């Protein structure tokens, strides 16, 4: 079965100890949409790296075009990390970049999620630079 569009907020765990259920769901859906898919899931996925996570990243690279970070407070009463709105597009070309818009002003454009998302230290530095008068004017904002 194929869908023109998929919009989803997949479950994150199954209650039986299975983690990253949302990644399994999104991975399955990547093969089921014809045009676009918009998924809400934790932004922390981008910073994780292991064999299983990298398998998902490689699959997502084929159609992921944009990720925008939002504070998790949009879901009242949650204690989860910030969330990302992930936009997938089947018309993505091989040389199209993946644009990742983090809270604040910094944006990354990557060829692949496997290129590496910066670590906590880099994030702390960028956050500092965004708030410092002397440096904030030099940070790219989309």
Can you annotate each of these PLM segments?
Residues 2-3, 34:
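Local beta-strand N-terminus motif with an aromatic residue
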Residues 6-7:
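Hydrophobic beta-strand segment of the Class I
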Residues 10-12:
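Non-catalytic DNA-recognition/assembly elements of restriction-modification systems
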Residues 14-74, 78-88:
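Conserved Class I SAM-dependent methyltransferase catalytic core
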Residues 72-142:
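C-terminal substrate-recognition regions of SAM-dependent nucleic acid methyltransferases
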